[in-house]
């Protein structure tokens, strides 16, 4: 489409007929509809404090502003907007923790995000919060093993003003969290056994899932290592796959 419009929402859904007369945001008539001139700027800063050899604190923040094309199943689109983020990290002995927040305004009416195929603006505002805590420890009595255990959490709050999630807008929770652990056991001078597991729970799926992993490593020489491994990987649907409700 050579004309990009503000969609008209009816009953929490983009009305494809009324939207044909929505407010005009871009008009590429007579020119190149695919924008080929765009720019990006970024700024970030970080403050680090090390009160001791095994203690470290870090605070970081930044922002980016820019635009560009994107390609997906729905076709070619143009994204514009600003992202603001902040992160705190702490390492204290065997403990590590971090928290992160990221907010993207999804583009405003004067610099919209849109799909060329539909010709409609899409609001893609989102806020993501992440947190993680991790602990490392040794078990000398169990094959001189080294272990890592942890927990992480992620919550993505989206707002599309009904232009993308439509009738799912008010029930689009997307929260994931999981526990994980990994250990390396020194079975002999040449053989290590690595065992790991992760349990994940998602707000959009009723049951959690466990993913195990194991590897037997044989160090035949300084230049040769053999590995026999088993791994089960999990991948959930994206928020777009779960909640899209768009004509």
Regions found by a protein language model. Give the residues of each.
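Periplasmic-side early beta-strands and strand-to-turn transitions of outer-membrane beta-barrels
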Residues: 1-79
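Solvent-exposed loop segments that connect transmembrane elements
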Residues: 2-33, 111-121, 163-170, 240-247
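N-terminal targeting/docking segments
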Residues: 15-16, 191, 224, 234
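One-face residue pattern on beta-strands with alternating periodicity enriched for small/polar residues
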Residues: 42-44, 180, 213
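Face-selective signature of the C-terminal outer-membrane beta-barrel domain
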Residues: 50-56, 60-62, 82-206, 219
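Active-site-proximal structural scaffolding
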Residues: 81, 207-209, 232
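Surface-exposed extracellular loop regions of Gram-negative outer-membrane beta-barrel proteins
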Residues: 101-114, 203, 223-247
């Amino acid at each position: 489409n050579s004309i990009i419009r503000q969609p008209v929402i009816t009953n929490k859904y983009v009305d494809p007929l009324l939207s044909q007369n929505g407010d005009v945001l871009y008009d590429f008539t007579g020119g190149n509809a695919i924008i080929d001139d765009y720019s990006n700027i970024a700024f970030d800063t970080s403050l680090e404090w090390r009160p001791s050899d095994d203690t470290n604190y870090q605070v970081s923040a930044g922002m980016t502003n820019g635009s560009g094309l994107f390609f997906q199943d729905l076709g070619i689109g143009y994204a514009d907007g600003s992202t603001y983020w902040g992160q705190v990290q702490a390492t204290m002995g065997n403990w590590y923790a971090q928290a992160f927040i990221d907010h993207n305004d999804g583009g405003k009416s004067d610099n919209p995000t849109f799909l060329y195929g539909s010709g409609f603006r899409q609001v893609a505002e989102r806020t993501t919060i992440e947190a993680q805590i991790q602990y490392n420890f040794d078990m000398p009595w169990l094959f001189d093993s080294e272990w890592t255990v942890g927990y992480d959490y992620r919550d993505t709050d989206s707002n599309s003003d009904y232009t993308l999630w439509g009738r799912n807008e008010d029930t689009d929770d997307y929260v994931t969290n999981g526990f994980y652990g990994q250990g390396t056991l020194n079975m002999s001078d040449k053989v290590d056994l690595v065992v790991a597991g992760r349990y994940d729970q998602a707000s959009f799926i009723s049951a959690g899932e466990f993913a195990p992993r194991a590897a037997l490593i044989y160090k035949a020489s300084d230049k040769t290592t053999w590995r026999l491994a088993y791994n089960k990987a999990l991948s959930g649907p994206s928020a777009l796959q779960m909640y899209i409700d768009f004509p």
